[in-house]
Amino acid sequence: MAGAAELDRARADLAAAFRWVARLGMNEAVANHFSLAVDDRGRRFLINPGQVHFELIRASDLLLLDADDAAVMQRPDAPDPTAWALHGTIHRRLPHARCAMHVHSVNATALGCLADPVLPPIDQNAAMFWNRVAVDVDYGGLAFEAEAERVCALLADPAKKVLVMGNHGVMVVGDGVADTLNRLIYFERACEVYLRALSTGRPLRILPDAVAEKTAREAEAYPGGGAPLLASIHRILIREGSDYRD
């Protein structure tokens, strides 16, 4: 289990991610949810309380749950039932997924509504996800326990860190908040560019497979990863006097 200082930092990082995603307009009403494992086994995790807008979430609001303790749903501040089903399952079944972010962002969700919901490598951002995205085309309703188990099985391969949840939204996983948030933002932008290119009705210029794979590997090895982004978000929020760390 993380020490007190480490846990405080984890809370602040996750709260900052909620605030930033809200600023980007990627959340939906008071739905959607993020989680972050805070112990070595990945079974204890932070998650947002149910029915609270991302723009209002503070570090102290985040719930500390045990993936093996379903009694958490009896708490007065229990998370959304689908949040518990999805994230509880992820932290029980997928120890490599330390952080998980689920949103119904417009562009990733629109991609998942296409008959062919695969993102082709039409630009540098899209190429970063080449062969690294799982796709679910068997939407079966709200993500309660059975649906959550089925969906999470699609992320069993550690190389697949994005799941396009067909007719639903997107789930992004990673090593921590910085890594996962960075991936979520880039994937949403890649989807936006692809959909805009499709909207022209003109032929697409798709990168060769070899170039896409090379780009993806280069991006994975790029120095810093998402850390500079998260550090910048903290600085911006602090400069603005945000209460996200409370």
Where are these regions (language model features)?
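Glycine-rich flexible loops
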Residues: M1-D246
